Amino acid sequence: MKFFTVLLFVSLAATSLALLPGSKDELQMKTQPTDAIPAAQSTPTSYTSEESTSSKDLSKEPSIFREELISKDNVVIESTKPENQEAQDGLRSGSSQLEETTRPTTSAATTSEENLTKSSQTVEEELGKIIEGFVTGAEDIISGASRITKS
């Protein structure tokens, strides 16, 4: 039973590490204004009260939503990863990869971003310690189970 509990915790910790921001290449979407407008997106422009709509004809009321049209062709997806970075062969260790993706840059715009980066690094270090403890515990359980023989 302890083995499955440890396995559950290790799985949870690994999943938590995989979901940390910055652990994968982040994608940002940007839109560009266009004259060709095939796709529609609604945004609120004005609101009417219930009293005014009950006494007036609804067809004469201004529309609650106005459609802004954006072309699907003009949506640009850009990666935050530099283009000139060469692909590396082999596997990198998880901790060095996490440190690389969350290291504060000199172009950090605000101190809040720097604080977020530092706290993210602290959380990653603590999760690394927890995972090491789980792995050690799992190894101890497995080695202890191999010594047990049926009578």
Swiss-Prot record:
Residues 1-19 form the signal peptide. It comes from the Eukaryota. Glycans are attached at N115. The modification Phosphoserine is found at S54, S59, S63, S71. InterPro entries: GLYCAM-1 (IPR007906). Residues 53-71 have a biased composition (Basic and acidic residues). This is Glycosylation-dependent cell adhesion molecule 1. It comes from Mus musculus. The lineage of its organism: Eukaryota, Metazoa, Chordata, Craniata, Vertebrata.
